[in-house]
Regions:
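Phosphate-binding site recognition
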Residues: 1-163
Length: 163
């Protein structure tokens, strides 16, 4: 990805704080939290997307805006999507949900979804870049935040138990 566009699909914490101070304070008041605690909760639930190594985290704007508008935390992005795509990939390749924290992709394969199904999962927003090994040119992927982690566990786990 071109470094100039790493935050095009979301917002940085700096942008969040600069543009949504009033909404953050209203959310804090509605939930009986301090502003600092509210920012920490927003970060844990909706931040964590990285589209390139060693970059600032990107917040999911859909979930942040819904949280601020409704003054309550929820899995807005996860609930707004159908997850059959993810379920089908995991089933087809016999992946376990726990493998998400061990997913790796070679840098030269970042544009080749046929080679590694985890790339498709990453491109769909369920995984993000956690680290990069310069020596081996290898990306370590992982679940970006609590919204995705809880969504995967709450929605997909029962599907796997049924099959």
């Amino acid at each position: 990805m071109d470094h100039r566009y790493i935050s095009i699909c979301g917002m940085t914490e700096k942008e969040l704080l600069a543009n949504f101070k009033e909404g953050i304070n209203e959310l804090a008041e509605a939930n009986g939290d301090t502003e600092e605690a509210t920012i920490a909760k927003l970060k844990a639930r909706y931040d964590g997307y990285h589209f390139e190594e060693n970059t600032v985290g990107i917040y999911n704007p859909f979930s942040v805006l819904n949280t601020l508008a409704k003054s309550r935390y929820d899995d807005y992005w996860f609930k707004a999507n159908t997850h059959t795509f993810l379920f089908d990939i995991l089933k087809k390749h016999d992946y376990c949900i726990t493998e998400f924290s061990k997913a790796q992709i070679k840098a030269n394969m970042m544009n080749n979804v046929d080679f590694n199904p985890f790339l498709d999962i990453y491109l769909s927003g369920y995984l993000t870049i956690k680290s990069y090994d310069e020596r081996f040119k290898n990306y370590q992927l992982g679940i970006p935040n609590k919204e995705i982690e809880e969504g995967i566990l709450n929605i997909l786990q029962p599907l796997f138990k049924q099959n």
